Design a protein with these regions (language model features):
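A surface-exposed, glycine/aromatic-enriched loop/edge motif typical of exported proteins
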Residues: 1-19, 110-154, 206-215
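Residues embedded in well-ordered regular secondary structure
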Residues: 1-80
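Short N-terminal secondary-structure initiator segments
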Residues: 1-21, 88-111, 151-181
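Outer-membrane beta-barrel transmembrane strands
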Residues: 43-62, 69, 157-212
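Outer-membrane beta-barrel domain signature
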Residues: 68-70, 75-76, 81-82, 89-90, ...
């Protein structure tokens, strides 16, 4: 209102009257809400849990090691913000097949699953832009829980909609990397210190992603 008046325009044409502004400021009239959308939409902390399990052992003839790790991290968005999951698997086997022949096998893989909200505009920053564009003069909820308030003038409906993957759309991305290697080593007994080694390796990375937007 003040910017409107200072720009030389009449006070009568301002979007809000002084009385309306005071009602929004007081926060005592349900018809004049003042919603803190950042506080309503965003968590103060991001829940996550991680679990690791390892196993190792063996004999003089064979040694082994195995590792499994799991991470689950929720989004900063309180409602329908999605989550990130990661699986780590690693194993190693060293074996002495014969007196002068040994083998080594290594394997590792990382699997990542990302499940987040999405809408077809402005890419990764759309949710953050929507938070700042969602106006505080709209309520975060309505008396009828089956209805959703429209809280934005930029055509998105508000960040409480676009930040919720159950209401706006989904962006699901799955990544997997695989590394595997194996080797054989043969010690030539006739020539001390001489050995021959064969080595094979695999390095693979893949990504699968799906986008879906509700009409």
């Amino acid at each position: 209102r003040e910017a409107h008046i200072q720009s030389g325009q009449p006070a009568e044409t301002a979007r809000f009257s002084e009385e309306q502004i005071q009602k929004y400021y007081a926060g005592t009239d349900p018809d004049y809400p003042s919603t803190d959308w950042v506080d309503y939409l965003m968590r103060k902390m991001t829940p996550q849990h991680q679990h690791n399990l390892s196993l190792q052992g063996g004999t003089e003839q064979i040694k082994y090691y195995g590792f499994f790790g799991y991470l689950d991290q929720e989004s900063m968005i309180r409602r329908g913000g999605g989550n990130y999951q990661r699986y780590n698997i690693r194993s190693n086997i060293d074996a002495k097949i014969l007196k002068n022949l040994s083998m080594s096998v290594d394997f590792s893989t990382i699997i990542e699953n990302r499940r987040f909200p999405w809408r077809d505009d402005q890419g990764e920053n759309s949710v953050w832009n929507d938070i700042w564009n969602t106006e505080p003069i709209y309520p975060s909820s309505l008396p009828d829980p089956t209805k959703i308030p429209y809280a934005s003038t930029n055509g998105t409906g508000g960040a409480h909609i676009t930040s919720n993957r159950n209401l706006s759309g989904t962006r699901d991305t799955d990544n997997q990397s695989i590394r595997a290697s194996g080797s054989l080593k043969y010690d030539v007994t006739a020539v001390p210190g001489l050995s021959a080694k064969a080595f094979v390796a695999l390095d693979k990375w893949s990504q699968d992603y799906k986008f879906f937007q509700y009409l």
